[in-house]
Amino acid sequence: MSTQQALAQANEHALSQANDLIKVGSKLRALSVLRDLLSDRSQWHSSLEQIMSLYVSLCAEQLDYQSLRDGIHHFKVSIMSQKEFSIVPLENIFKEIITPIEQKVDELKEKIEKENQENPLVEQNEISLIDPQQTLLFSYMKYLFEAYKAMIEVLTRQNTKFEHTKFDHSKFDSTLLKISTQALNYCSKYQRKPDFMVLTELFRSSIEQLFKVPSLDTVNTHIEIRFHQLTVAISLGLYLIAYKSIEDINIMLFSLLVKPKPVVLATYYQKLAQVYWITNAHLLHAYALYKHYVYNKNYNMNFTQADSQLYSSVLLVAALSSPIQEVNQNQSLLQFDSQSQRAMGLASLLSLQSIPKRETFLVDVRKVTNEVYPELADLASIFEKKTSPLMFAKLLEPKIKFIEGHAQLSQYLKPFLRVVFTKIALQVSKVYEVIKIEEFIKLVPFYTKTQIELYLLESIKRKLIGARIDHKNGVIRFGHYDFDSAKISDQLSNLATGVGKALNMIEPEKKQQQHDKLKKEVYVKIINSLQDEHRRILARKEIIEKKKIYMEQQDRIKKQKEHEELQKKIQEKVARDQQRLKEDMERREKEQAEEESQQNQLDQTINAIDKAKVEMKAKIAKIAKQLYILERAYREEELPVVESLQKTKAVEDKQYFESTQAEFLKLHREVHDRNVTEKARLNRIVPEYQKFTQAVIEERKKQLPALQKEQEKRFQEFLIQQEQDVQERKAKREKARIAAAQEKARKEEQERERLEQEHLEQERLEEERKNAPYVPPSSRRTFRDDDDEREESGRWGGRRGGDDFGRSKADEGDRWGRREDAPPPRRDEGGDRWGRREDAPPPRRDEGGDRWGKREDAPPPRRDEGGWGRRDDAPPPRRDEGGDRWGRRDDAPPRRDDAPPPRRDDAPPPRRDEGGDRWGRRDDAPPRRDGGGSGGFGGRRDDAPPRRDEGGDRWGRREDAPPPRRDEGGDRWGRRDDAPPRRDGGGGSGFGRNQGAQGDQNDSWRSDNKKEENKKDADGWQTVGAKKRY
């Protein structure tokens, strides 16, 4: 058999075993079986994909993302074991991981949102309660994120725990891009900011690996991932992560790529412009748009005329929206404060050594913005011309309306208006010294008075203009009141320029003569200095060559130093890793010692608390008794004092009552007199009152029939509605009852078919047993001969539901091994007596039953050659009337391995009552039947069928077990082909007998069973010949 065939067979076996475990409800054991298989597989086979699919579904049901991560790593190792492999199976597994969980999350989220919309008040009143559906949703979202994280780790890095050889992960670039995009979209869709931050750190850790092994495709893949990460970060409002993302892109573009693609650079500058806009760096934002426009214009073949018009218009408005810089900017650039450092850091992303000047940048922008919208064609010229401040706002009014109405330009409206305001303020400050506030407000119609004052103060703070707001006189006074030298120098230079122009206009001929004379002198000097200039040029060329050589040497030295530093960093990293591992080991040992110390301390504390409780209880009892005695003494002493106080209080109360009663009678008489007087006064209006009330009552009587009729109509409608509701509820209940009845009938039909199939299978096994050849005892192997074989195959240990027992010599056909220190076997009343240890409790047999001595050190029983203990590869044993039928564990499938199940060491010793075996019940054993049967386990289950009391043993039958049957009126146990003949004596439990053996046919238990041959038992079975039927 080839290796691939062996792998396929082993995989199919594991898959079938896992499916069997799933059918009986043991999904955790099925998951463990598949995990063990994947961890042992280092070679690829196509059947592994099916196994991995089942493994993924089990992990999703259990929400076990740790097992999922390990399984993905093992599956990756199996795929990479091929010389030429395909990543399609890995992509299919990733799809099976993601798709069902995303659907489940969407369903739960929609359900929760729907419930919240239907019951908003319930949601507000139950804020403090934990919603189980919300908790389940968070569990699924946690599992989905951990799955994404595990898949990204598998595709980007090597896990030394599972992978022992280095591998080029660039083959997974396409899959990595797809999975990373889905993970980032998941964070954006469900607003998972913490998960998004974990993903960004995971991506940043891969940059170091890119520097070690740079690959063009891998770098481009990571750049695309960072672009998508930047978009998601901006949508989530995580601007610090967005800045780090653009920094990573800058490093990978200009450090790892020799010549980046123009398309990638255009996208980079577009994303960079978004970052600058968020940070309010409007000038750098416009500069990034300028770069983006240039790359698209020169390299993008799909760049249409409409795109060019839109991009150039956006660039022009963005450039003009950049704030006007200070006149004397050198002082601010020389200050190494945090703001300047921040500005330089942002400018470095554009490969700039300093912040560009606004005027220079506007000149460059005018060269490339010739295709703007017609409405903005003269916008730049309006800003450049010296226009009157009284007309500046009116000229820009249509431009402002166009910008406000355009979708792509409207975001620049606020900074554009700020620049327009600053421009107007600067022009007004040069024309006027004093201007009324109302007049100045008219010059800026798009701002309110409060906004104008605020922006004017900001301009003064930035030293763009010099002004003071005089609210007392309602004016604005312009001028630099600190006598700034810059203002004075501007006035002097303007005066010199004006005087020079006046002189040229007064004496033009004299000026021309002087100019010609100066020109001739210059020509003579140039001719005389030609040789000297030539020598200077040659010397300069030589200096340049030397400087070039020096620069090349410096570059080589710098690269060598960088290489040495990189090697040094690698060595330091290895040393740090080794030190970290050592510290981790020491830390684990220390933590283990601390845990042991804490546990000991905790035990001591608990003992001390228990002791203190006992002492405190005694003290409390003593103090309670003392308080009881003291209280009784107090009450005996205070009794005379209380009686005297009570008498005094009674006299005082009587006096108080008499005085208050006299006062009350006096006041009551006064009130009565006033009421009589008032009644006499009001008697004159009684007729009018009676007349009015009688009119109102007559009017109400006329309206009463109509109101009664309307009320009767509403009542009848209510009754009809109630009747309809009752009929609808009845119909729903009837429909549910019919569905339940149909489901019950379907399940009963399935159960009947299953029982019939098991019955036929049992008959087939019985026919095989009847036709098996006889094996003489001399050709069988003894227990002692198979000692080594049992130890190697792991067949020692307790049988399910049974107890350990000793071995004895063979007696009348059975070859049972016996320990050397055990007494010889004996038989009482036709039964079996097996060897036991001298220190074991004495066995007993009541009414033909067995009592097996239990030894702690005895080997486990097994059923070889007709003895006790069922072989794992044999069919499950049965219990037919009078014999033992060992039930299988309800919560476990049939065992295929040789390993014994765990046995409870604290189980009670076995006993036999009323002619049946009573074995110590295991926690995982089937329920026993009380009374009349051997092998009853534990207390009787409420759902078990009634037992049979008339003779013989009756074992509880599992729901899925085959129906028991009788052969020839007695017990007929199916035996293995290699089983020995049974013992001749009666009693004990009859295990598979040989056809040639002459057993005792007149045993008491067998005779009793024949009497009950044609009677129905409690389960509804009737014995007819050798079969059972309903």
From Swiss-Prot:
Extent of Basic and acidic residues compositional bias: 576-591, 743-771, 800-931, 939-985, 1003-1019
GO biological process, one term: translation reinitiation
Domain PCI: 308-483
Protein name, UniProt field: Eukaryotic translation initiation factor 3 subunit A
Family, as annotated: Belongs to the eIF-3 subunit A family.
Subunit and partners: Component of the eukaryotic translation initiation factor 3 (eIF-3) complex.
Organism per entry: Dictyostelium discoideum
GO molecular function, one term: mRNA binding
Disordered: annotated segments: 576-603, 737-1030
Entry coiled-coil feature ranges: 94-126, 527-620, 720-772
Highest taxon in the source lineage: Eukaryota
One GO CC annotation: eukaryotic 43S preinitiation complex
Subcellular location(s) of the protein: Cytoplasm
InterPro entries named among the record's database cross-references: EIF3A (IPR027512), eIF3a_PCI_TPR-like (IPR054711), PCI_dom (IPR000717)
Keyword terms: Coiled coil, Cytoplasm, Initiation factor, Protein biosynthesis, RNA-binding
HAMAP family attached to this UniProt entry: eIF3a
Record function comment: RNA-binding component of the eukaryotic translation initiation factor 3 (eIF-3) complex, which is involved in protein synthesis of a specialized repertoire of mRNAs and, together with other initiation factors, stimulates binding of mRNA and methionyl-tRNAi to the 40S ribosome. The eIF-3 complex specifically targets and initiates translation of a subset of mRNAs involved in cell proliferation.
Major localization class: cytoplasm
